[in-house]
Every structure is written in structure tokens, then in C-alpha cells.
């Protein structure tokens, strides 16, 4: 009886370890059930893009310092845009919104790092064949269409 119990626990641990979920879902999936006029969802999407760019800056720092620097700049621009939007829609002081957005961006970056490492161990890429690549495409579109002017 005890052996069956231990075997069941071991089996559960093995299954849970191999089926480890990602820290986040894609931005597009997150937005799929949100109203287009939902300012909180828009702000979250922008700050996700900021965190994603910090993630890219981190993984590119040694091999491509220029790319890393540009990703940091893009991260700052996304965070600034999100801070302005948050400040206007929440009636918070801009400084408070900016502090919140920067902290959120750094936390989101840590989730991308965790998921990127998991993806690296499976595919040899930090982001290809994962939601991270989908986020990259969406954030590139947002940057070119709305941020970079």
C-alpha cells in the first residue's frame, strides 16, 4: 500500500515537472477577451512590450551590445508611453505611474527570462517556437506603428 502511494506521488511529480507551464501567455491571447477601449489592458500590453525589450537587451548584451542598447531604448519608450496612459486614466501622478511601470517591466522581464530559458532547453532558442516570438512580432508592430514617430 505504501509502495503504491509513493509510486503515485513520484508519478505525479514526474508529470508535473515535464508539463511545466509558462509564466505568461501571449499578449494576443491576453487581449483576446478584452474590450479595445480597456485602458488597463492597453497599458499592460505596453508594459509587457517594455519587459520583453528588457529581456532581449539582457540576452543580447554580450553578443550584440548595439542591439542590446537599442532594446533598452525601446523598453524605455514603451514604459514612458504606458506611464503616460496610466497617469491619465488612473489620475495618478506621472512619477507614481512611471515608478509602477518600471517595476512592472522589470518583473515581466524576469518572467520572460524564465520562459526563455525553458524554451532554450527545448529548442535551442530563447524565443522561437514560443509565445515570446508572437509577443516580439506584436511589440515590433506596436513600436513601428505607435511608439516610434
Positions of PLM-derived features:
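Bacterial N-terminal signal peptides that target proteins for export
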Residues: 1-7
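Processing junctions and N-termini across compartments
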Residues: 15, 43-44, 133
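Sec/Tat signal peptide C-region and signal peptidase I cleavage site
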Residues: 17-22
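Buried hydrophobic residues that stabilize the cores of well-folded domains
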Residues: 26-27
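Short, charged/polar, low-complexity loop and linker segments
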Residues: 30-31
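Short N-proximal segments of mature Sec-exported proteins
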Residues: 35-91
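Compact alpha-helical subdomains of small soluble proteins
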Residues: 74-149
Amino acid at each position: 500500500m505504501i509502495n503504491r502511494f509513493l509510486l503515485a506521488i513520484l508519478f505525479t511529480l514526474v508529470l508535473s515537472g515535464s508539463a511545466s507551464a509558462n509564466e505568461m501567455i501571449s499578449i494576443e491571447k491576453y487581449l483576446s477577451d478584452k474590450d479595445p477601449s480597456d485602458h488597463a489592458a492597453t497599458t499592460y500590453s505596453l508594459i509587457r512590450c517594455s519587459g520583453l525589450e528588457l529581456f532581449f537587451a539582457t540576452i543580447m548584451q554580450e553578443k550584440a551590445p548595439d542591439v542590446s542598447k537599442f532594446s533598452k531604448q525601446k523598453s524605455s519608450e514603451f514604459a514612458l508611453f504606458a506611464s503616460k496612459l496610466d497617469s491619465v486614466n488612473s489620475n495618478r501622478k506621472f512619477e507614481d505611474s512611471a515608478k509602477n511601470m518600471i517595476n512592472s517591466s522589470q518583473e515581466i522581464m524576469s518572467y520572460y527570462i524564465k520562459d526563455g530559458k525553458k524554451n532554450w532547453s527545448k529548442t535551442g532558442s530563447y524565443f522561437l517556437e514560443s509565445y515570446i516570438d508572437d509577443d516580439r512580432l506584436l511589440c515590433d508592430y506596436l513600436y513601428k506603428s505607435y511608439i516610434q514617430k
